[in-house]
């Protein structure tokens, strides 16, 4: 998955009853019938051949298949099963609709929770190059929220959402709150930022969060893929000053991944998702039949927040691992290997958050890397995939996509947004 996504959503939130959402997620556990062969679709021909060989070797057609020990596959979600990040889309959908259940004092505590004071890393400055301190920008965002809370009719005021969105306070709030998210994720250990985004769900029920997530998904799927720069208010510079950030809008379903999931199940291979987003948000996208992936809610492993009286708190669930990087391997071991006695047959991912689970299990026949030409830990896995290109027993494969369309392409190389040349590696 990729952090640092920013979705400017202005659609009206749809209301989904808990009963209806539960019904939809239950239906998702039974996918439609699919052929046992993997549709070539837009897969790289080499990848389709390798995946089909792995399915044949481990699925129901194999002489060694044992139904009491069903093989399984594990997929990262954001930027693997879809293009872009559904939880980050939700962050801005929540901002745009001011869908908070926080008093101003609660918001003031949440926006500062677990984040050190002091200047962010040098990449995060004001538009005129001055350092931005956490305590200053938090103060500005708190002041914005207090005004928004007092004035928006969906909270404690009487102004419409359209009136609110035309205000300087809203403009400042949107740009600065997302700038904070980016800056926190890049300036401090990633665990701080990944959990911080979840604290804004405080006082929501699971049904309320999932209804908001579905509305956000639907808007993002219909939104254009485009990069837009957002700047905070120049008339309300506050303590931090004027900041700006750029976001890549839109989400797209990766039809080849969705098809692979159905083909795996048709061949007696179970499908799981491991995500560094909160599990309840990804369960909507992975399980709602409107999106077609067919992953039941219990098969999603992600971040978890402690609940109190049926509502989210700002406490991470005690004794639950942080499901990112090495933590994804921990989650697979604690949840799946502990139950089954063996590791995943196939793992798919796109970033450093997935690099360890892609390579940590001896039982894994193939690791599918959605190629984003990244360095770091996933870059090391990608280098191995490039070295094994075309080998019939390749342990890693690179799958290309075009970021202008959000579609996979029949190549190992990818096309970055704004570029016109396919590339294999960073």
Regions from the PLM with identified roles:
Residues 1, 21-49:
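C-terminal segment of N-terminal export signals and the immediately downstream linker at the start
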Residues 5-26:
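N-terminal export signals
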Residues 10, 35-40, 46, 65, ...:
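C-terminal cap/substrate-recognition subdomain and adjoining C-terminal extension
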Residues 54-55:
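N-terminal regions that are enriched for targeting/export leaders
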Residues 71-84, 358:
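Asp-based phosphoryl-transfer active-site loop
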Residues 101-202:
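Non-catalytic, alpha-helical, charged scaffold/linker segments
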């Amino acid at each position: 998955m990729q952090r640092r996504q920013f979705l400017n959503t202005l659609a009206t939130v749809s209301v989904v009853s808990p009963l209806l959402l539960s019904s939809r997620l239950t239906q998702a556990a039974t996918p439609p019938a699919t052929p046992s062969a993997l549709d070539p679709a837009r897969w790289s021909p080499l990848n389709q051949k390798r995946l089909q060989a792995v399915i044949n070797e481990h699925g129901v057609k194999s002489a060694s298949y044992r139904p009491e020990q069903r093989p399984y596959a594990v997929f990262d979600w954001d930027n693997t099963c879809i293009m872009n990040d559904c939880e980050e889309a939700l962050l801005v959908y929540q901002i745009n609709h001011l869908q908070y259940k926080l008093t101003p004092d609660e918001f003031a505590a949440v926006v500062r929770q677990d984040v050190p004071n002091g200047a962010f890393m040098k990449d995060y400055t004001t538009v005129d190059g001055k350092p931005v301190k956490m305590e200053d920008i938090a103060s500005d965002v708190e002041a914005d929220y207090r005004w928004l809370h007092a004035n928006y009719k969906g909270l404690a005021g009487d102004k419409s959402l359209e009136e609110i969105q035309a205000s300087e306070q809203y403009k400042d709030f949107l740009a600065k709150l997302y700038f904070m998210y980016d800056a926190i994720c890049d300036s401090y250990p990633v665990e701080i930022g990944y959990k911080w985004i979840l604290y804004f769900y405080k006082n929501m029920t699971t049904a309320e969060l999932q209804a908001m997530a579905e509305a956000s998904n639907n808007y993002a799927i219909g939104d254009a893929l485009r990069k837009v720069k957002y700047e905070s208010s120049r008339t309300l510079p506050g303590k931090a000053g004027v900041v700006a950030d750029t976001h890549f809008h839109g989400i797209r379903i990766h039809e080849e991944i969705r098809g692979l999931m159905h083909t795996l199940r048709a061949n007696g291979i179970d499908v799981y998702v491991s995500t560094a987003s909160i599990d309840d948000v990804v369960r909507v996208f992975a399980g709602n039949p409107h999106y077609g992936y067919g992953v039941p809610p219990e098969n999603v492993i992600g971040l978890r927040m402690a609940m109190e009286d049926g509502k989210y708190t700002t406490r991470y669930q005690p004794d639950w691992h942080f499901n990112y990087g090495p933590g994804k391997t921990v989650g697979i071991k604690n949840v799946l290997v502990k139950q089954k006695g063996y590791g995943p047959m196939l793992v798919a991912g796109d970033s450093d958050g997935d690099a360890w689970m892609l390579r940590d299990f001896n039982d894994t026949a193939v690791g599918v890397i959605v190629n984003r030409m990244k360095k770091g830990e996933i870059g090391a896995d990608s280098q191995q995939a490039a070295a094994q290109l075309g080998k019939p027993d390749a342990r890693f494969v690179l799958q290309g996509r075009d970021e202008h369309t959000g579609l996979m392409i029949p190549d190992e190389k990818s096309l970055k947004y704004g570029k016109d040349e396919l590339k294999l590696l960073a």
